[in-house]
């Protein structure tokens, strides 16, 4: 016995599985638009990634042509689809205590500072970085009110929602000590077995907000004792990198620290930052 789908369902299924054409001209337009909106440089070898991510947007909107999608974007500069476009093309690779050598340096720096110690996580992604910063500061400075604060931002609003929730799979916490896991997380039970959630006592010290590093103004509560901007500059060209670093300067306190990613080098881009350690820069006191 055989059965067949109704004609309309068959057409929809074909639409969902058929590979759409991404022309050179469309790829160039996509590259120009994401550069203008987010500063991200898309090399030619990213073409398949761009297709795989954006085709989901086309299909969710019932579109079968990249040209129609781009026309939809460009016809309304304030459309909510712009945020979905940006969210689709940002890369979010992160982990708790990634580049672990940074956190002892942060702790040592925090011990030697007076007043409220403030940190900005400028590419917070799904929250692992700002919560790692928060755990480090809680272990180092305690949790007395007004002792420290973390501000966390990202251009991708979807990952910020996950960050705010503070919910992770247990295996994502493999870099934490048993003491940190017990002190700062609650284990899920029943239908939430295998999940953990950041305890509210820690989450209260972390504020999340969307922020585009290309924005004309940074709505951040600076100045900060330290800024983490790790593994994001690699997606920008040198002109954009220099502009962002220039704008970081007034947002850092004298002798404040800037933490970079393992493949990033800022020494030649902004003379006011001097290398303090492995991918760690200090703002000159001058």
Swiss-Prot record:
Report keywords, A-Z. Answer: Chemotaxis, Methyltransferase, S-adenosyl-L-methionine, Transferase
What processes does the entry annotate via GO biological process terms? Answer: chemotaxis; protein methylation
- Enzyme class at the top of the EC tree: transferase
Q: Which residues form a coiled coil?
A: none
Give the CheR-type methyltransferase domain ranges: 15-286
Q: Which domain of life is it from?
A: Bacteria
What EC numbers are recorded for this enzyme?
2.1.1.80
Q: Which organism is it from?
A: Escherichia coli (strain K12)
**Gene3D superfamilies associated with the record:** Chemotaxis receptor methyltransferase CheR, N-terminal domain, Vaccinia Virus protein VP39
Establish whether keyword Thylakoid is in the entry. Answer: no
A GO CC annotation recorded here is:
cytosol
Q: Which NCBIfam families match?
A: PRK10611.1
State its role: Methylation of the membrane-bound methyl-accepting chemotaxis proteins (MCP) to form gamma-glutamyl methyl ester residues in MCP.
Q: Which reaction does it catalyse?
A: L-glutamyl-[protein] + S-adenosyl-L-methionine = [protein]-L-glutamate 5-O-methyl ester + S-adenosyl-L-homocysteine
MF terms (GO), sorted A to Z: protein methyltransferase activity; protein-glutamate O-methyltransferase activity
- Give the gene that encodes this protein: cheR
> What Pfam families does this protein's entry cite?
CheR, CheR_N
Query: Can you say what this protein is called?
Result: Chemotaxis protein methyltransferase
* InterPro entries according to UniProt: Bact_Chemotaxis_MeTrfase, Chemotaxis_MeTrfase_CheR, CheR_C, CheR_MeTrfase, CheR_N, CheR_N_sf, SAM-dependent_MTases_sf
Residues annotated for S-adenosyl-L-methionine binding in this entry: 92, 94, 98, 129, 154, 212-213, 230-231
